[in-house]
Structure formats: structure tokens, C-alpha cells
């Protein structure tokens, strides 16, 4: 943590009296969100005492109304962006930070050059410029998220939250379900500190949805 004293809190209101606050918005894995207005207020309060708000927007692209991109020039704010989550090209290894000129200049001096390949820059620029694809993908993800929620609910999962890219559910037999799904070739994420939780990525197509539904249905029938 670079010599900083780090405190992990579950709610932004509990972050006082920190000078630097890092918020993942939406949060992974529970999908907790804060409105742009709340985050801007925090950035202004922190900037007034020489502090900084860092907002990780890795999972914001499906819900652009949560993005602070249009406010990136205010003092005391750094936004972190991840290309691979929304565009499905994690191997491209492309991400970036945005903020006002003074903040970004300071960040560049502290971090030094960060290598990004030419193909990654070209693919990223084209992808971010394809607004029609982004609009259609957001609609599809919202539909698929609702479809996944239905499958999980039908198999006795409590939907805790998530985003339009993944869902977090709780089940009394989560540990057993994790192993049996793995044997069926379906990988989900467990949480050792929360043994009832499983995180599900959105199935990629109708066949994958059917496989998941059949696997969970078979488990519940045992």
C-alpha cells in the first residue's frame, strides 16, 4: 500500500477521516453503487484538505449513467477505466486513468511510462468509438442478467446483487454446488470468507444458459 495505512470499509460514510479514498463503483462482487452526485461531493471534500478520491470504474460501462467521465476534470478525483470487462477482451491488457491535468501530470511523474501496445491502442480506439455496438450490448447484457437471475431464483439462490456482467447469489449448499458445477465444466467464483456466496458470470449463449439451468436443476433434484 505504498506506506499508507489502509482501512477496508463496507460503506463510504465509514471512510472518514481518510485523506485518500478508493471506491469501486459498481463494487465487485455485490454490485453496490454510489450516485455521481455523492461521489462528486466526496471528491470536493477530500480535495479541500489535499486529499483524493479514486473511483475504479471497471464495471461501469454497462451502466454509463454511473460514470463520472464527464466530471473527470474536477479537483481531487481520479477515474480508473478497464477496457476488457465490457468489451470482453481481457487479454488486450488495456486500461487508463482520467482526471484533471494537474492530477494526471502528478500521476505520470509518480508512475513513469506505462507500456501499451500499438494493436491494443488501435483496437481500443475503434471499440470505444462503436456506439451502436455498445448500445446493443448494454441491452443484451440487461436481458441476459434478468435471465440468469431467474435461473438462480428458480434454484433457491438469494440474489444479493451484482452488475450486468455478473451476479452474486447465496445458497445454503454453495460449497457443494461449486464443486458439482466445476465437475460439469461450469466455473463460478466462491468466497471463503462468505461460504454461502457464489458469483456467476453471464452465460455466453443459449446453449450455455441451458447447460447452467440443467446442471442446477439436476443438483436441486438430488
Residue ranges and their predicted role:
Residues 76-152, 157-159:
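PLP-dependent aminotransferase class I/II
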Residues 142, 152-184, 202, 206:
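Conserved PLP-binding catalytic core of the aspartate aminotransferase-like
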Residues 4-62:
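Active-site phosphate-binding strand-loop segment of PLP-dependent enzymes
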Residues 2, 48-49, 74-75, 155:
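Helix C-cap/helix->beta junction micro-motif
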Residues 38-42, 68, 148, 177, ...:
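A general structural detector for well-ordered alpha-helical segments in enzyme core domains, enriched
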Residues 8, 55, 81, 188-190:
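Hydrophobic residues in well-ordered beta-strands that form the structural core
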Residues 35-37, 183, 193-222:
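PLP-dependent enzyme catalytic core of the Aspartate aminotransferase-like
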Amino acid at each position: 500500500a505504498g506506506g499508507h495505512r489502509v482501512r477496508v470499509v463496507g460503506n463510504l460514510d465509514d471512510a472518514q477521516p481518510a485523506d485518500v479514498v478508493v471506491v469501486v463503483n459498481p463494487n465487485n462482487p455485490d454490485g453496490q453503487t454510489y450516485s455521481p452526485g455523492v461521489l462528486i461531493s466526496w471528491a470536493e471534500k477530500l480535495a479541500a484538505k489535499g486529499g483524493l478520491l479514486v473511483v475504479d470504474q471497471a464495471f461501469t460501462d454497462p451502466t454509463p449513467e454511473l460514470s463520472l467521465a464527464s466530471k473527470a476534470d474536477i479537483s481531487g478525483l481520479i477515474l480508473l477505466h478497464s477496457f476488457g470487462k465490457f468489451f470482453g477482451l481481457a487479454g488486450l491488457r488495456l486500461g487508463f486513468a482520467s482526471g484533471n491535468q494537474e492530477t494526471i501530470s502528478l500521476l505520470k511523474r509518480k508512475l513513469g511510462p506505462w507500456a501499451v501496445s500499438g494493436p491494443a491502442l488501435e483496437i481500443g480506439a475503434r471499440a470505444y468509438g462503436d456506439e451502436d455496438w455498445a448500445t446493443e450490448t448494454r441491452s443484451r447484457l440487461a436481458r441476459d442478467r434478468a435471465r440468469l437471475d431467474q435461473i438462480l431464483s428458480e434454484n433457491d439462490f438469494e440474489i444479493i446483487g451484482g452488475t450486468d456482467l455478473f451476479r452474486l447469489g447465496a445458497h445454503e449448499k454453495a460449497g457443494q454446488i461449486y464443486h458439482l458445477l466445476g465437475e460439469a465444466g461450469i466455473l463460478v467464483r466462491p468466497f471463503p470468507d462468505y461460504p454461502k456466496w457464489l458469483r456467476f458470470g453471464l452465460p455466453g449463449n443459449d446453449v450455455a444458459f441451458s447447460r447452467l439451468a440443467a446442471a442446477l436443476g439436476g443438483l436441486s433434484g438430488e
